[in-house]
Amino acid sequence: MGKQMKEIIKAFKQKDYTLFDQFYEMTNRQVYYAIIQIVKDDEIAKDLMQEVYMTFLNKIDQFKIDGNVYAYLSMMGRNSSINYYHKQKKEVHSDELIDMIESDEGVNEYDDTDDILSLLNLLNKDQREVVVLHTINNLKFKEVAEIMDKPLGTVLWLHREAINILKTKVGDWYEK
């Protein structure tokens, strides 16, 4: 975690929330994509994001300063989405990613959410989750494996399969 993020977390632990807007700007995409891949509804995703941030701030004392805040918030978002899903007893829709998947920048600078979601919809649930956690949330494969409770080799294989699917589909779209 960067020095700036550590300072923000320290301020939160002292009940100083003046840097919340900055914190939100640094983390909202990761939380949004962790949620939207499960609930598939923008308004619900935004509501769940509010819950995630409120819960995070209410339980800030439990968060370790050296912890990965992005992974922590993503996991909270994912869990809140799953809880919402179970409460609603809705069928989970599949979701998938983009042609920027292999870039080092991930999709943090990419603003076309609809394109991202339609590409994510090309993948199965596990592939999509690996892509979102690794590419959008910038987590290391080892962290993704821990979150998904899968062996590292499986996570790497799922990522490679997802990349191949996305390359094929994106290529087909460009040829049209």
What are these regions (language model features)?
Residues 2, 83, 90-118:
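Internal acidic/polar
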Residues 13-14, 51-68, 87-89:
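Sigma70-family region 2
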Residues 61-65, 75-95:
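Arg/Lys-rich amphipathic alpha helix in sigma70-family domain 2
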Residues 82, 146-176:
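DNA-recognition helix of helix-turn-helix
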